[in-house]
Regions:
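Conserved alpha/beta catalytic core and glycan-binding cleft of carbohydrate-active enzymes
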Residues: 39-41, 48-165
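Broad hydrophobic/π-residue packing in well-ordered secondary structure
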Residues: 5-6, 12-13, 17, 22-24, ...
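The substrate-binding groove and active-site-proximal loops of carbohydrate-active enzymes
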Residues: 1-3, 20-30, 155-165
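Substrate-binding/active-site clefts of carbohydrate-active enzymes
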Residues: 1-17, 27-46, 50
Length: 165
């Protein structure tokens, strides 16, 4: 019943407001079949339709294999996921207990091979195992509405560095 409501609501938005895409917050709590159905039904209305969202693996009553999470992105070939891998490699870890963990851009140069992977949309095995089969499945970002801004993160994790660096 919930899946039907989500699908019908999305179709209504596409038909009524002529939107061409949706962003799903906490998409990982929804199931793969529902997300694929949303894409399929909305694409039938607007062939340029796209979906992207937060594919975090959230606690849920669903088995992991059914969740619309980033780890299951291969089962959602037309849906993109925000890449926390890219964010963490570029900026450094963002959890409140990891604010001092640097990323490549803040001086962790040992991450160069993983950075190459990230710059290839995590679609190659350069530096680490590929996460996505196609660049259309990933949204690379460094900053959004969550956690510290890049400036605040740099100030915190690089406070011991000299200004010459």
């Amino acid at each position: 019943m919930c899946a039907k409501y989500i699908i019908d609501a999305c179709k209504f938005l596409v038909k009524t407001y002529h939107i061409d895409g949706l962003r799903f917050d906490l998409m990982g709590i929804l199931d793969i079949d529902t997300m694929n159905a949303v894409y399929r039904e909305c694409c039938a209305i607007n062939t340029d339709f796209m979906i992207y969202g937060e594919g975090w693996d959230m606690p849920s009553f669903l088995d992991f294999r059914q969740r619309a999470s980033i780890g299951n992105n291969a089962q959602m070939p037309f849906i993109a996921h925000f890449s926390d891998r890219f964010r963490d490699v570029v900026k450094g870890r963002t959890a409140s207990n990891e604010v001092n963990v640097k990323g490549y851009c803040s001086g962790a140069l040992y991450l160069i091979d993983i950075m190459k992977n990230c710059l290839s949309a995590s679609c190659t095995n350069e530096g680490m195992e590929a996460m996505f089969a196609n660049p259309r499945n990933v949204v690379n970002y460094v900053e959004c509405h969550d956690n510290m801004t890049s400036w605040d993160k740099l100030k915190e994790c690089c406070k011991e560095d000299s200004k010459d660096i």
